[in-house]
Regions:
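Substrate-binding/access-modulating region of protease and related hydrolase catalytic domains
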Residues: 1-90, 103, 173-176, 180-182
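Flexible loop/turn segments at secondary-structure boundaries
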Residues: 27-31, 67-71, 102-106, 146-149, ...
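Catalytic-core environment of secreted peptidases
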Residues: 98-113, 117-182
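Short, small-residue alpha-helix embedded
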Residues: 181-195
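Secreted peptidase-domain scaffold signal
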Residues: 228-329
Length: 453
């Protein structure tokens, strides 16, 4: 049924660009983040790898709702024990949770359950999942609020979102929870796709996630004082609430760069299937401006988005190493490294069997770090530090890790191409410096040629 809903409009007009949005979920808590038959179908439809001419698709899925009013009354503790519903664990989809800014209600003697900017009482999280599985939700949008008095908790129209009615007897109705949130996300995705029709679905997903920020209320709910704290924050709130204007435009003190590229992760040798390519992206930092800022704090945000092909075997869903066709990683050159030393370090990491420890090193400036950030097929991290220190980095590598294209050589997929989208931004909130103008002429030279491992 799900597959038919996807293919039917494409039969009528196959070349039209679309965003597929689904708010239908299953509530059986049996997967704990592991891929299911349903989520694997979403991943397969998204990447479309088996088609003669692949036509990738972007799926926006609701995270699923908490419907038990008793749980609303136990907010916010209830958020950590209500898992994201199937197929929200899909690697390739954009899974959407809910937060709320709605705190004004018309009912006397009731007060809002959630503070302004906090997670909605209706949203689900991935806190109960095994930590190896993807961070979900990816982002959160407005999903409405609940209200309580001294006796019970309920939802009211004044705390919900206005929408059109399905009934012919009325024009408008209200909606809430992650269904409403996922609809808002699909709208943003459609706006981005209309503005940048040449961008891949992976890039649209990256731009939405890259533009998200946590509200002060989210940071109060889940203080991120260390890397495990950031992981807990993301498993509840995703990367925060996206901003369409931030996704569409670079501003004076903030610069966003987008690269769509590909590499061949593996090759067949006499000694078996080995890693093949890494891509070096020369980041056109405005070096003079960054060096002049010296100790001024700047923020670098990196988002790597790609679609994996799910393992055709049912056994593949049991492990994050066996489920995806391939995995990609990113790492930035350290301040004290030469370019040759950086390449050597990344080569060693790519050849590592599980590729989890070769790039960790000094991760102090990163919110998550190399060990935490590489889950699923959407990786994001934030580097914070002195502008002069960032000016000395300048290169970012994208390289392969383990996947079944490598481990299942009999399927002859080891020579497949892996496409990806990379979004990088620099933000200097405390400085009055025009970062955009400084690099405008350098953007076309972002990517160095692939380097064979």
């Amino acid at each position: 049924l799900f597959s038919s809903a996807v293919t039917r409009p494409e039969i009528l007009n196959g070349q039209r660009k679309r965003i597929f949005s689904s708010a239908v979920t299953a509530t059986a808590y049996r997967d704990f983040g592991r891929p299911s038959a349903w989520s694997s179908m979403v991943d397969s439809l998204a990447v479309d790898a088996l088609a003669e001419t692949p036509f990738p698709r972007l799926f926006v899925l609701s995270a699923g709702n908490i419907v038990d009013r008793d749980h609303w009354g136990n907010y916010p503790a209830s958020l950590s024990v209500n898992q994201i519903h199937d197929p929200g664990q899909s690697w390739n989809a954009l899974t959407v949770g809910a937060f709320t800014d709605k705190v004004e209600l018309n009912e006397p003697e009731f007060i809002p359950v959630a503070d302004q900017g906090a997670l909605s009482p209706f949203t689900t999280t991935s806190m109960g999942w095994e930590p190896v599985w993807p961070f979900k939700p990816d982002v959160v949008f407005e999903g409405g609020n609940a209200a309580a008095n001294t006796e019970f908790v309920d939802n009211f129209a004044s705390l919900e979102l206005l929408t059109t009615s399905a009934s012919s007897h009325r024009q408008f109705w209200t909606t809430n929870a992650t269904s409403a949130a996922s609809a808002l996300c699909a709208r943003m995705a459609a706006r981005l796709m209309a503005q940048y029709p040449e961008y891949r679905p992976e890039t649209i997903r990256a731009l939405i996630t890259h533009s998200a920020q946590w509200t002060p209320a989210m940071l109060r709910m889940y203080p991120a004082r260390n890397k495990s704290g950031f992981a807990q924050l993301i498993r509840h709130c995703g990367w925060g609430s996206p901003d369409v204007e931030r996704a569409l435009w670079s501003v004076k003190n903030s610069l966003t760069l987008v690269a769509e590229d590909s590499l061949y992760p593996y090759r067949k040798t006499r000694d078996g299937i080995k890693t093949r390519d890494l891509n070096l992206h020369a980041l056109p930092w405005p070096l003079e401006q960054l060096q002049e800022l010296q100790d001024t704090q700047v923020e670098l945000r990196v988002t790597l988005s790609y679609f994996i092909e799910p393992n055709p075997s049912a056994r593949g869903s049991s492990s994050r190493y066996h489920y995806p066709s391939h995995r990609l990683r990113f790492a930035m050159k350290r301040q004290t490294e030469s370019l040759d030393e950086f390449k050597t370090r990344i080569n060693a990491a790519a050849e590592s069997e599980e590729s989890e420890h070769g790039t960790t090193g000094n991760d102090d400036n990163w919110s998550l770090g190399a060990t935490q950030r590489h889950k699923g097929s959407l990786h994001q991290d934030i580097w914070r530090g002195a502008a002069a220190e960032l000016a000395s980095c300048g290169y970012l590598a994208v390289y392969p890790a383990q996947g079944w294209w490598r481990t299942r050589g009999a399927l002859q997929r080891f020579d497949s191409e892996a496409k990806y989208s990379l979004v990088v931004s620099i933000h200097a909130p405390e400085a009055d410096v025009d970062l955009y103008a400084a690099v405008e002429t350098l953007v076309e030279n972002m990517v160095e040629n692939p380097v064979e491992i």
